[in-house]
Amino acid sequence: MKEVREYIKSNTEGFASVEIVERENNHGCGVNIVEGITQVSKEFGRVIVVEDDILTSPYFLTYINDGLELYKDDDKVAAICAWLDPQYTVLGDKLPESFFMNVVHIWGWGTWWRVWKDYEFDAGKLLEQIKAAGREDEFNLGVKSKPNSKNLQLQAAGKIGTWDYQLCASAFLHNRISLSSRYAYSNNIGCDGTGIHCGPTDYYKVNVRLSEEYHPLKKIPIELNEEICTIRRRNLWIKEFKRNSRIWHTLRKIYHFIIGKSKKSVKDSKS
């Protein structure tokens, strides 16, 4: 911890001013981030959030600031998101310059106090409100296993320590949607197994490069992109199928067994 603090203090060039908040105790990921966003957004009316495993394009701040200014008076907009989910790239040239989606991607993003003041950290309370509104199926994109509800339940039970599931649920309850761009202005380089919430994977590196030029934002109608919603629904269903299907797990075991034997045969033939 001491090394991290000293490193931060020695790398403050390029900023007009830097305020470092040092905790006496480890507040954990969720509480610490929520308190930080609350403090900054309340004081300045808006906030840009970048965690320590996020790599940004040189135009990241320009993009986020332009978005925050463009939609500052539009209550239906929850956030401006810089990260481009690789699953959206299947649309190819049909992917718009910018679009609205029913999720908040928190790997480099910005929002306003007008939105953040409605944030609810209590996941159990959020799930109760979603059920009371008769919107649980909509919240889970029609996936019968209710993966989004399960995430809130895990958080409420203390089995995970997150804050972003609550952000998405809070935005959902207030009928807010988020802006994203076809150009990636941020990327997560922490999915290498060294972090808390993500195991090693190359998924987030596929087909996505940080933008090396800026593509000026133009204000568009605030409405969900249905093609993006369809992609998210399909991929969420596939993810749940893989997680819960005995057939899928059996096929994986067979695949790894065959690959293992194949590698062993190649090794034996070379020796």
Model-derived regions: residue spans:
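An acidic/histidine-cluster motif and surrounding catalytic segment
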Residues: 1-49, 54-271
